[in-house]
Amino acid sequence: MDVSSSTVQLNTSDGKMDAYVAQPKDGGNYPGIVVIQEAFGVNDHIKKVTERLAAEGYVAIAPDIFHREAERLIPYSDMSKAIATLQRVQDPKAMEDVGAAIAHLKSQKNVKSDAIGVIGFCMGGRLTYLTAAHHASDIKAAVPYYGGGIPAGNPSPLSRTGEIKCPMYLFFGAKDQLIPMDQVGQINTELTTKKVPFQMKIYPEAGHGFNCDDRGSYHEASAKDAWEKTKSFFAQHLK
């Protein structure tokens, strides 16, 4: 499916926020998906994910969660700066940003306003989990990839699990040095206890960031399998 892309500006309480939008060129009505960035910004990888979703028949939008920062793009080689920047991200502000992206999708004539999902990676994986709770009335499917720190924060995304209404598919790597397996077990237990419909896949050979082919941690077999599962999951719950 041919895709067109553009950058739009959305209003937040802290001023304008850029958001990258990719959508099918063909007319018609499509489900919408919010794409939440890694701790490196809305870079080429995140734009590529947004475009891949559009090619599958979605209107996808990636809000720039770093729009309050002087530097909104951080190279993969500068992990210390990425960590420092993500630590300044406040959950309520990030949820406002995601809310603006959801509102934009719902305002578009080619978007099915009752079929909106969310996907995110790394920092965005954690925020995807939080979005499923915070924006529960809008989100119909959520896919967090290697979301670190889900039990962290006050309140933590994990503590809001009971608010989640949509099905989830969570992806982790067993060799992820940033997300210990006991944390993954904690998430599994809480989702089960709160009766959230979910699937979880842990790839034994994958580490953190395994989906990103611009990073040294890219693990092709795991990434391809996760993407096929992601496509099927969104098609099942949004189309």
Predicted regions and their residues:
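N-terminal cap/leader regions of alpha/beta-hydrolase-fold enzymes
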Residues: 1-239
